[in-house]
UniProtKB/Swiss-Prot annotation:
Cofactor(s) of this protein: FAD
Keyword annotations: Cytoplasm, FAD, Flavoprotein, NAD, tRNA processing
Residues given in the record as NAD(+) binding sites: 268-282
GO cellular component terms listed in the entry, alphabetical order: cytosol
SMART domains tied to this protein: GIDA_assoc_3
Name this polypeptide is given: tRNA uridine 5-carboxymethylaminomethyl modification enzyme MnmG
Localization in the cell: Cytoplasm
UniProt cross-references to Pfam families, sorted A to Z: GIDA, GIDA_C_1st, SAM_GIDA_C
GO terms for MF: flavin adenine dinucleotide binding
Domain of life: Bacteria
PROSITE patterns to which the protein is assigned, alphabetical: GIDA_1, GIDA_2
GO BP terms: tRNA methylation; tRNA wobble uridine modification
SUPFAM superfamilies: FAD/NAD(P)-binding domain
Amino acid sequence: MNKFIVVGAGHAGLEAAFILSKLNNKVYLCVLDRKYVANCPCNPSVGGPAKGIVTREIDALGGIQALAADSTALQRKILNSSKGPGVQCLRFQIDKVYYKKWFLEQIDNNENIELVEGEVTEVIKNGDTATGVMIDGVKKLEAGAVIITTGTYLKSLTFSGKDVKNEGPEGFKNSNNLSEWFKVNGFELIRLKTGTPPRIKKDSIDYSNLQIEPGNGTELYFSHWSKNKYIDYELPCYLIHTTEEIHKIINDNLHLSAMYSGNITGVGPRYCPSIEDKIVRFSNKPRHQIFLEPESLELDTVYLGGFSTSLDISVQDKIIRLLPGLKKAEVIKYGYAIEYDAINPIQLYPSLESKLIKNLFFAGQINGTSGYEEAAGQGLIAGINANQKIKNKEPLILSRDEAYIGVMIDDIVNKGVTDPYRLLTSRAEYRLLLRNDNVLDRLIQKGYEIGTISKEQIDLYNQNLEKKNKLIEFLKDKKVGMYTLLKAHTNNTNFSLYEFLKRPEIKLIELLKLIEFDYSNYDLELLKNIEITVKYEGYIKKESRIVNSLKNLESIKIPKDLIYDKVQNLSIEAIDKLNKIKPLNLAQAQRISGINLADIISLKTHLEQNA
C-alpha cells in the first residue's frame, strides 16, 4: 500500500485524502488540531454559479463534497432557473457544525486515513523529490508524495480596524514555519487577503418585515449516487439591503478599516469585495444586497452574507444596527479580514505538481484561489495525480471544454493570480458544454478508468444513457399532427416530437403527458438532460465544432526539457514566459498572457522540425 501525506484538512485536503483512500492508499492527514477539520470560516454554503457545477464534477469523479453537502443541507436552491442551461446551478445552505461532524465520522470510519495532529514545519526532500514532512520540528513522517492544502493559515494575520492578531481563521492557531521553508526552497510567495462578515444572534433579529428567500424543496441533490438528507424541511434565508445612512458612516470611517488604513498589504478578492470596498468602488449604487443565512441548528447565529468587513468593531456596531430588522441586533462575532501567504501557481504543472520539487503537489487557497468548491476541486485533482505519479500513470488533466475544474486549473497555472481567484461562468468559453445536467456525460468514464468510480456506478449511468438514447429516438420517429399538439385552428401538418420539442415554450414532460407516454421510470434530472440536449442541439454542435478545431494544438506536445532560447524568432517575452510556465502543449502555450500568434507559429515550426 502506497503512503501519502496531505497537509491541511480543509476542503482541498479532505478531497485529496478521501480520493487517495478510495484508490487503496494509506493517507496521513495532517492538521493543526482535530477541531480544524472541515472548518467553514466564511459562508455556510456549498455551490453557486460555476461553483455548484464544480461540486457535481467532483461527485462525477468519485469525490466527496457533494455527499457532504447533501447530508448537511439546511436549504436547497436552483440558481438562474429562468436563464439558459449554461448558467443554471445548485446552491445549498449547510449546517457548518454538522458538516464538520459528518467529515470527522467519515475519517474515523476510514481505515486508510490516519489523522495526525500537529504543525507541519517543513517538507523532507531527497534531492529534488519530496519524501515526507516534519511535524512540530521533531516527528518525521515519510511518504511517496506530499500534498499541501494549508488554506489561509500560512503566516496569517487577522484585522478588525487597528486590531491585528497573529492567528488563523476564527482565532485558530496559524502556521508560520512552512512559509519560510517554501521561501528558502525557491518558491515565489504572494500575499493575499480575504474577509468574513459579522455573525448575529438569531433571536435578536426582527424578521417581521424582512423579505423571505425560500429554498426550492428538499428533493434537490448535488450527488448523483445517494439521496442523503439532514432534515426533511428547509430553513428560510432573508434578503435585506444597506441604506444611504450606512454608506455615509462607512465613507466617514474608512480610516478605521484595516483595508483602507494601510494595515493590510495583501490583495483582496475582486469578485467578493468587503462592504467598505463596495461602497467605494460602486459609489453610484444607493444600496447593496445582504442575505441573512442560518449557520447551524446547533448555533444561535446568523451569517450576514455580502457584509464582509474589516472595520473597527465600534463602526460595525453602528452600521449593523442600521440594517433592516437588526435595530436590536446582538453581535456574536464581528467581521474581520485575514491576510495570508500563498504560492504563485504558475510554479505548478496542470497536474498540480510543483515544477521545483517532484512528488510535491498543491491544492486550494495556497494556490491563490478562493472558495470551498474551488479548493475541493483542486484537492481531488491533486490527490488523483499524486496517485497517478507514484503508480507511473498519466496524470488526469481536464481540458477547458471538459470541466470547470479544468478551466480553473488552466487559468491559474498559465496566468498565475494577482488576487484570490474565483470561478465564474464567464471564465469558461464553452458554458453550454459545461452544464449542471451533463456532468456525468463529461466525466464519469474518466473516473471509472482511474478507479474512483465503481462498476455499479458506471453500470447505472450506462442504463440511464440507454434510456436517454431510446427516448430521443422515439421523439424523432413519432410524428404527430400540429392540431393534435396545439389544439389550434391550423393545418394538421405532421411534425416529429423531436422537432416540436425545440420550440422554446414546449416542455418535455408536458409533451409526454399529451401523448400519454409512460415516463415513470425516468427521473426528473434525466428528463431535464434530454430536454436540453434536444432544445440546444444546434448550439451544442456549434461549440463542439469550435472545440474540435482547437484540439490539434493540444495534440502537439512540448518536451519539458525544451530550450526555448534555441527556438528561432521567439520574442524575449515569450522565452521568459515559456521558461517560467513550461506548457505541456501548444494549446496551453497559446493561452499564456504575452504569447502571440507569431510565437506559436515559431514554436510549432521548431517542434515539427525536431520531431
